[in-house]
């Protein structure tokens, strides 16, 4: 293991002398969303506010170009998908017309040809924040995420409390001091058909819903990795959705980032190797929860993982490290590798760089 990581450090040092993977993002970028269509990358929202940008990865002079602003206001934790020439944005957390923080269940569509947005007359049957989105056979699929009513109620209470610190402490204690199942994270799988703009029930997890999981899909299989089991408590679980045949099958794989797990990690594929990297969590929270402390992360400091794990022979192996721990950026499949754009580093600082993780013969290469 030490030899592997030492070799990785040498590779990282050699890449440092070369050109960066992508130009720095126009603003420090975290908690946003992004997609790739052929060779064009689109990113937006999160710490970028309502801004969206695109970049042609094959251009000689690579640069981010500003697009039309998102009309739905600033959003964190929205997701996106590119289907049949259009970019779709699903939900997110933002402020409503009254200035209250809330979870949205709406859908916006961006047309690259006209550089224009439209809000669709379509609403998911539940809120979408902390959820994941992936595309299969021309449809967008959504699963996971927080419970809209519980989350919105929490922020309504905080708004009413104003600057009353005593009231805020009581609200937080009430909100965090519950068991995981009492938060009703979404375990349903929903499908969105762009041609009809209709939502449909596509199945549900036999286990539990998560928020802030990493997602990657290839062919008929999709993997959901880690995420929150409740606010402040992560899981090390890995779920596999198999669309092969007529019946969707849910499988549970060996855990990763044990015992505490992380949220906001990055997942991808390279030469058929499943990759999981980064993420943030609270070390010791799982032990606290198992010992009966529901407010499991109380008093704990958020830590950021730099670990890179590969799925190999039915188990996860730590196979390398990022140059720094990071979470809550965008992960995309590009050039047969995992492309990470932006994210959040220690102290919650948003970053502007990109990272490319490639795998060959179970050996990891990291390019910054």
Curated annotation (Swiss-Prot):
Gene3D superfamilies membership: Kelch-type beta propeller
UniProt entry keywords in alphabetical sequence: Carbohydrate metabolism, Isomerase, Kelch repeat, Periplasm, Repeat, Signal
Subcellular location, record wording: Periplasm
Residues of the active site: 228 (proton acceptor)
Example GO molecular function: racemase and epimerase activity, acting on carbohydrates and derivatives
E.C. number: 5.1.3.24
Domain of life of the source: Bacteria
Signal peptide feature range: 1-19
Annotated InterPro entries: Kelch-typ_b-propeller (IPR015915), NANM (IPR056734), NanM_proteobact (IPR019936)
NCBIfam families: muta_rot_YjhT (TIGR03547), PRK14131.1 (NF010730)
PANTHER family: LD33804P (PTHR45632)
Protein's recorded name: N-acetylneuraminate epimerase 2
């Amino acid at each position: 293991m030490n030899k592997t990581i030492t070799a990785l450090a040498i590779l990282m040092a050699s890449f440092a002398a070369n050109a960066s993977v992508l130009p720095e993002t126009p603003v420090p970028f975290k908690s946003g969303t992004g997609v790739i269509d052929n060779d064009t990358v689109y990113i937006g929202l999160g710490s970028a506010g309502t801004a969206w940008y695109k970049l042609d990865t094959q251009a000689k002079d690579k640069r981010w170009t500003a697009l039309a602003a998102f009309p739905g206001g600033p959003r964190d934790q929205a997701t996106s998908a590119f289907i049949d020439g259009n970019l779709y944005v699903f939900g997110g957390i933002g402020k409503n017309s009254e200035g209250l923080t809330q979870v949205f269940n709406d859908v916006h569509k961006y047309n690259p040809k006209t550089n224009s947005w439209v809000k669709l007359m379509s609403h998911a049957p539940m809120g979408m924040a902390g959820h994941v989105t992936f595309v299969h056979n021309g449809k967008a699929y959504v699963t996971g995420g927080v419970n809209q009513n519980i989350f919105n109620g929490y922020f309504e209470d905080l708004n009413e409390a104003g600057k009353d610190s005593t009231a805020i402490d009581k609200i937080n204690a009430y909100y965090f001091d519950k068991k995981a199942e009492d938060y009703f994270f979404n375990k349903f799988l929903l499908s969105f058909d762009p041609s009809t703009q209709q939502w449909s029930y596509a199945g549900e997890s036999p286990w539990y819903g998560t928020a802030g999981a990493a997602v990657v899909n290839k062919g008929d299989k999709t993997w959901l990795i880690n995420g929150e089991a409740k606010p402040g408590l992560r899981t090390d679980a890995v779920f596999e959705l198999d669309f092969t045949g007529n019946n969707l099958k849910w499988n549970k794989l060996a855990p990763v980032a044990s015992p505490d797990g992380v949220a906001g990690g990055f997942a991808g594929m390279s030469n058929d190797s499943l990759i999981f990297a980064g993420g943030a969590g609270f070390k010791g929270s799982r032990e606290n929860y198992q010992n009966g402390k529901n407010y499991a992360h109380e008093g704990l400091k958020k830590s950021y993982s730099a670990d890179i794990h590969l799925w190999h022979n039915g188990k996860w192996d730590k196979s390398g490290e990022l140059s720094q721990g990071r979470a809550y950026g965008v992960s995309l499949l590009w050039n047969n590798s995992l492309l990470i754009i932006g994210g959040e580093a220690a102290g919650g600082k948003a970053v502007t760089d990109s990272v490319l993780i490639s795998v060959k013969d179970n050996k990891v290469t990291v390019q910054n």
